[in-house]
Design a protein with these regions (language model features):
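Non-catalytic terminal/accessory segments
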Residues: 1-456
């Protein structure tokens, strides 16, 4: 029999901090894995919504309500109080998201985003905090995307540890076709019901799923999918893949393996490391069959198994060939050796696709802002370079960030000389400018080695 927890709002009414309530819920979820939470909706308070408002970025795009954070703040307390009143009466109805399209990195395709109205952003953020307190205790160690205290770099560290120290011989790559657009709403609600029995919370989540999309002035219903762009989307996506993929991998597929197998997932992007060839070769078909049950498909052209690891590197050297490579989280991973040549190492460099996309995006940005004052351009460009180094400046990828730095210099020189009626630069004058207003030099600041035993 599944036990139910009826959280009482009394503690919160008596002044118990919101964070304490969420921590207590997380502790219960961690201790009692089959517990269903019956009373969570009382947490949708002014305190929580005000905190969500403070966390909201001021430069976020507006939804169909066209209300900005600055405008909402003009009468903040009254606005939030009235919002809470509608929530408690369960009279709150989300508005359709505003559909926009952004370029997909490294591709001519566009990625659809759904921009919620301002109050929808607040309510989504509050629901995400509540759901996260429960499901963060359930998610497996191999899941890294959109989770507190975890990052892409943590996923890459786990990958290095697995490939270099756990005998990986094969990598299985898979791509879920249009994951966010194909989430089945009925399955989503059934998955949430495993842990949540508060009908008001479930009803509000369902309303967001069904809120619709406005595009070119027309509203259409959303019968499936989770719009990318809302703060509740990442936690819902993680819940869906937790049940559809992660638990199946841990409890079914891996238990049937002859060798070791490990899943490393960041949102809907994932890699499987395996030691046994037979296990590796059966993975794509079994994955496709599993995902089909939940309305998802694998992209056949992006799903493959390759030999990769210590043995793969040795086999390739024996036949004077290069070992296979694979891309994950913006990096191309390849087989190599330590500097002294004595030990196998997996190394990584910025993937060609991501590199080209980053250079193209920077080119468009420089073209657009080239008429700004030179000092303004140099300051903003410095921030962009630092952001690039913070992500791509990882162990073994100095040449990747250095190459990007040199491409940036060439683009900057080109576009500073395309400003009408402005001073043109010779290369010597441009070098003088860089000495006066220096750009941050390429650096590796993220080390992807584990010191000591890794736990997941």
């Amino acid at each position: 029999m599944v036990e139910q927890s009826r959280e009482t709002p009394a503690g919160h009414r008596n002044g118990e901090p919101l964070g304490t309530n969420l921590l207590r819920i997380a502790a219960k979820a961690r201790k009692e894995r089959k517990l269903k939470f019956v009373n969570l909706y009382y947490l949708m308070t002014e305190e929580l919504l005000l905190e969500c408002f403070r966390r909201l970025s001021a430069d976020k795009a507006a939804g169909i309500d066209e209300v900005t954070k600055t405008e909402y703040a003009e009468n903040l307390e009254a606005n939030v109080k009235e919002l809470v009143d509608r929530l408690q009466r369960v009279a709150y109805k989300p508005q359709p998201v505003r559909r926009v399209y952004i370029p997909k990195p490294g591709s001519d395709k566009l990625r659809p985003l759904g921009i919620p109205s301002l109050e929808d952003k607040l309510v989504q953020s509050a629901l995400a905090r509540i759901l996260g307190a429960i499901y963060e205790e359930d998610f497996i160690g191999g899941s890294y995307g959109f989770r507190p205290g975890r990052s892409c770099h943590d996923a890459l560290r786990a990958l290095s540890q697995t490939v270099e120290w756990e005998g990986t011989n094969y990598i299985a790559e898979a791509d879920i076709k249009g994951f966010f657009d194909n989430v089945d709403h009925d399955w989503m609600m059934r998955m949430l019901a495993h842990r949540i029995a508060d009908k008001r919370v479930l009803r509000m989540v369902k309303r967001f799923l069904m809120s619709g999309v406005m595009e070119d002035g027309e509203t259409r219903a959303s019968e499936e999918g989770v719009p990318q762009g809302g703060s509740i989307s990442p936690v819902l996506a993680n819940v869906y893949l937790h049940y559809a993929l992660d638990l199946w991998f841990e409890k079914v597929y891996r238990n049937g393996c002859k060798g070791k197998a490990k899943l490393i997932r960041y949102a809907d992007d994932f890699i499987v490391c395996l030691t046994n060839k037979e296990d590796a070769m059966r993975f794509p078909a079994e994955l496709a069959e599993r995902l089909k049950k939940f309305g998802l498909e694998v992209e056949p052209t992006k799903t493959k198994v390759l030999e990769f690891g210590r043995d793969a590197e040795r086999h390739a050297r024996a036949r004077r060939a290069k070992p296979a490579t694979f891309d994950f989280l913006g990096f191309t991973h390849y087989c190599s050796r330590t500097k002294d040549g004595r030990r196998f190492r997996m190394k990584r460099v910025t993937s060609r696709k991501k590199f080209r996309a980053k250079v193209a995006a920077l080119k468009e940005w420089l073209k657009r802002i080239r008429m700004k004052p030179t000092q303004w351009i140099m300051q903003r460009l410095g921030l962009k370079l630092r952001g690039h180094y913070q992500y791509y400046g990882v162990t073994d990828n100095y040449r990747g960030v250095a190459r990007f730095y040199h491409e940036v210099r060439k683009l900057l020189y080109k576009w500073l000389n395309r400003r009408s009626q402005r001073r043109s630069y010779t290369w010597a004058a441009f070098e003088d400018l860089l000495r006066a207003l220096p750009l941050p030099k390429p650096r590796v600041g993220v080390h992807l080695f584990y010191r000591g035993r890794m736990t997941v």
